[in-house]
Amino acid sequence: MFIQTEATPNPATLKFLPGRPVLENGTLDLRDAEQAAQSPLAERLFGIAGVSGVFFGADFITVTKAAGEWQQLKPMILGAIMEHFMSGAPLLAAGSAQPSDADEFFDSADAETVATIKELIETRVRPAVANDGGDITFRGFKDGVVYLNMKGACSGCPSSTATLRHGIQNLLRHYVPDVTEVRPM
């Protein structure tokens, strides 16, 4: 098994591409060992000293470090990923549900505007962000403000504020005049 690695805009996060599907639907962002109990692979990764976050996408895994150098962490992370996939173990523990983004909020009168915002995020924003090892999902829309959840490499990335303000906000304002601002949640 060959696992590729890619740098992300966040220097504390690396993207690992195992060359096979990772998560069937959506994404899953795990920020501590307690949350990692949902996934045998995440438990293995959080067992490595210095790992502070694990994010699963359709065909990639991003790992965030709190401490340590990538030179020391990367071989251990690669080993844990390889062991997991070679064992045939499931990504999610029995009884763990696939992730859901059901807790959205917006006024029903804004449903058409929200549909346009979500389509732009799905078609223009998420594919670009996934290339960097992260994900951005719609959370809500209220009084002209779009609320987004930043996950994976995007969470805590030094350039995420610029991406949000200059990239995503400008895109949404261009296509959806009702949008005045974009904020992270």
Task: Give residue ranges: language-model regions.
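Domain-level signature for proteins that mediate thiol-based redox and metal-cofactor handling
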Residues: M1-M185
